[in-house]
Swiss-Prot record:
Interacts (via Death domain) with tub (via Death domain). Interacts with Pellino (Pli). Residues 1-25, 144-176 are annotated as: Disordered. The gene is pll. It catalyses: L-seryl-[protein] + ATP = O-phospho-L-seryl-[protein] + ADP + H(+); L-threonyl-[protein] + ATP = O-phospho-L-threonyl-[protein] + ADP + H(+). Plays an essential role in the Tl receptor signaling pathway that establishes embryonic dorsoventral polarity; the signal directs import of dl into ventral and ventrolateral nuclei, thereby establishing dorsoventral polarity. Tub recruits pll to the plasma membrane and protein-protein interaction activates pll. Residues 213-499 form the Protein kinase domain. GO terms for cellular component: cytoplasm; cytosol; nucleus; plasma membrane. This is Serine/threonine-protein kinase pelle. InterPro entries: CR_Ser/Thr_kinase (IPR052059), DEATH-like_dom_sf (IPR011029), Death_dom (IPR000488), Kinase-like_dom_sf (IPR011009), Pelle_death (IPR037924), Prot_kinase_dom (IPR000719), Protein_kinase_ATP_BS (IPR017441), Ser-Thr/Tyr_kinase_cat_dom (IPR001245). It comes from Drosophila melanogaster. Changing residue 350 to E: Reduced activity.
Length: 501
């Protein structure tokens, strides 16, 4: 007897034995069809399942026919909900009940999905929903699951090495925290498959590399955990330790999925302008990701370095252009290296990291999503993710995801780099009602030289042409209509006359 059938049979036996339940309530719990689920509940359930991207596991578990699987896949490619189509087929054509769906979720260990529909099944089945998060030691002995998570749900966060989400909540060393494999059906073998060519590092080595997680080696602290400087195998590394401080189980799952997302994509794409991931550790006290240490800090920090207590020299015009060029190359690689474009989703100065030679590398891959097959196509997603002030209006307002999202974000970065202003800065006093983009548009028409960073000598000759080319590219990248934005390849072609490497 299958796991689904076993759960149903046990529930039915318990219902028959329970004489205190009313006949009408028992009848509802056992026979309510999936198609009768209230629309808000169904919408929430589909959004959750789509975020986990588990429709293939669901289809496999119930043995849908190949043509039905193809039908679901086709709906997903059109930007529609794959989970909703699964429910249409399995719940509609075959008239399955909510209780059967609950049993299916139990079999695949989709515990949060079980919670979403628990009010529509017998209370006797509620005992199958785990009350607490399993610990690392419990999961190490747990069997593998065929369910997997391909893309974490689109919640905004800063999960890169820069760890720009500065949540100062503390945690103790003995606190029980979930590992990468403990939530969202991410098991050890799933993580290891995603990191096939990546080194799995012994936790004790990382503990030793950081002098026992010494506070002196801590580079930053955020909502997802802490980042430490370490010396491992004679390499200077940055080690991100996952603490998952949120008390909310759903939020813990989001954080875990984003960590898995980062592991999956940083391992599968290698480029000079994409942050190098050296290895991972999931069998010790806390899950860890190990990166190349970027000694130059973030672009955001360098752009504000003149305001620091120990100020650094302002980046030169040529350095600003080189950083912009390298970032553009990294984004172009993400968009074109695979059959399906990868959309970073959170391009901003805080996620552009610099090595000791000021060469840029894009970090924070927790929000990367696979986009539509074509570079100029659009897919509608369930939630907006990323840093909103860097996101285009069609994504913020209508959740329309395309490579144009990254292009727009890069355009804002270009304007920040060459004007020396942050997107959140107030523009000059007589222009207080204008944001950075509106201000640049106005000055571009009236007095272009006023736009340039004031902490540097005014550029001249070819250097001036280079700066104006970059600002103009920033304006084109931030066009309101995504169809008017250039591709990253077109941006690189604009930069070609000024490339010296």
């Amino acid at each position: 007897m299958s796991g689904v059938q076993t759960a149903e049979a046990e529930a039915q036996a318990q219902n028959q034995a329970n004489g205190n339940r009313t006949r009408s309530r028992s009848h509802l719990d056992n026979t309510m069809a999936i198609r009768l689920l209230p629309l808000p509940v169904r919408a929430q359930l589909c959004a959750h399942l789509d975020a986990l991207d588990v429709w293939q596991q669901l289809a496999t578990a119930v043995k849908l026919y190949p043509d039905q699987v193809e039908q679901i896949s086709s709906q997903k490619q059109r930007g529609r909900s794959a989970s909703n189509e699964f429910l249409n087929i399995w719940g509609g054509q075959y008239n399955h009940t909510v209780q059967t769906l609950f049993a299916l979720f139990k079999k695949l260990k989709l515990h949060n999905a079980m919670r979403l529909i628990k009010d529509y099944v017998s209370e006797d089945l509620h005992k199958y929903i785990p009350r607490s998060v399993p610990t690392i030691s419990e999961l190490r002995a747990a069997p593998d699951s065929s369910a997997k998570v391909n893309n974490g749900p689109p919640f905004p966060s800063s999960s890169g090495v820069s760890n720009s989400n500065n949540n100062r909540t503390s945690t103790t060393a003995t606190e029980e925290i979930p590992s990468l494999e403990s939530l969202g059906n991410i098991h050890i073998s799933t993580v290891q498959r995603a990191a096939e060519s990546l080194l799995e590092i012994d936790y004790a080595e990382l503990e030793n590399a950081t002098d026992g997680w010494s506070p002196d080696n801590r580079l930053g602290q955020g909502g997802f955990g802490d980042v430490y400087r370490g010396k491992w195998k004679q390499l200077d590394v940055a080690i991100k330790v996952m603490n998952y401080r949120s008390p909310n189980i759903d939020q813990k799952m989001v954080e875990l999925q984003q960590s898995y997302n980062e592991l999956k994509y940083l391992n599968s794409i290698r480029h000079d302008n994409i942050l190098a991931l050296y290895g991972y550790s999931i069998k010790g006290g806390k899950p860890c990701l190990v990166y190349q240490l970027m000694k130059g800090g973030s672009l955001e920090a360098r752009l504000r370095a003149h305001k620091a207590q120990n100020p650094l020299p302002a980046l030169t015009w040529q350095q600003r252009f080189s950083i912009s060029l390298g970032t553009a190359r990294g984004i172009y690689f993400l968009h074109t290296a695979r059959g399906t474009p990868l959309i970073h989703g959170d391009i901003k100065p805080a996620n552009i990291l610099l090595d000791q030679c000021l060469q840029p590398k894009i970090g924070d891959f927790g929000l990367v999503r696979e986009g539509p097959k074509s570079l100029d196509a659009v897919v509608e997603v369930n939630k907006v993710f990323g840093t909103k002030i860097y996101l285009p209006p069609e994504f913020r307002n209508f959740r329309q995801l395309s490579t144009g999202v990254d292009v727009y974000s890069f355009g804002i970065v270009l304007l920040e780099v060459f004007t020396g202003r942050q997107v959140t800065d107030r523009v000059p006093e007589n222009e207080t009602k204008k944001n950075l983009l509106d201000y640049v548009k106005q000055q571009w028409r009236q007095n272009r030289m006023e736009l340039l960073e004031k902490h540097l000598a005014a550029p001249m000759g070819k250097e001036l042409d280079m700066c104006m080319c970059a600002i103009e590219a920033g304006l084109h990248c931030t066009a309101l209509d995504p169809q008017d934005r250039p591709s990253m390849n077109a941006v690189l072609k604009r930069f070609e006359p000024f490339v010296t490497d």
